[in-house]
Amino acid sequence: MIARTDDSRLASLKGRLVVSCQAYPGEPMRSPTIMAAVAQAVVEGGAQGIRAQGIEDLKAIRPLVDVCLIGLVKRGSDGVFITPTVADALDCVTAGADIVAVDGTRRDRPDGQPLAATIAAVHAADALVMADCGSLDDALYSISVGADCVGTTLAGYTGARPVSRGPDLELLAELVAHVSVPVIAEGRVRNPDDALACLNAGAYAVVVGTAITHPTRIARTFADQLAHGARRSDPEGSR
């Protein structure tokens, strides 16, 4: 299978920011309407792409933004849970995804189909595939079966590499040096300096999620810092 690396939808992301608009189950913002509003807001702020999960979220976001939409489905939290089946991938395309993000590892999938089957089905539906990888081996495997681009999304989460404090720049550089398709940096990009470091390491585009779209985590960072500072400055707190 041949990757479609010259596709205009993928080309629109080159050197640009992609924002992951996702909320965790049970959180106040876990609503397609809210995620669609977040997507609109970050596009107004300059995002050139949106990454979103869940069919209803994709359906809500698609009519409201005209940038590249990377779609996925999450099922569970162990093993292959990012767009784990061929049917899930096709549902993402039907919901409006330009690029479908899938697990790019060699692990068994719940429908028993190989990654190649998912990629072939997505290509037949005129969409592209982003393979979320945790190692160079994952990326090379995904590309061999037709992935159009690869991401560092799973770095530190498959057992192949330790979890890095920030973005896994070492893996990013390794992928850039050894693969023939665009490499998208994703995972633990916490500030603009991290994002720029990813571009400087050769990333085709950079995905930022929690640092932009997760107010609970952002607020906790501020609250914890203030609480820590207050304890240090309070003489009573040192006794």
Please provide the spans of the model-predicted regions.
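Alpha-helix-loop-beta-strand connector modules within alpha/beta enzyme cores
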Residues: 14, 55-87, 94-95, 111-135, ...
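General beta-strand structural signal in soluble alpha/beta enzymes
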Residues: 19, 50-53, 71, 101-102, ...
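Glycine-rich phosphate-binding active-site loops on the catalytic face of alpha/beta enzymes
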Residues: 22-25, 44, 73, 95-109, ...
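Short, small-residue-enriched loops and turns at beta-alpha junctions
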Residues: 24-29, 76-82, 106-112, 136-141, ...
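A short, hydrophobic/aromatic-rich structural module that often spans a beta strand
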Residues: 62-76, 114-128, 138, 145-157, ...
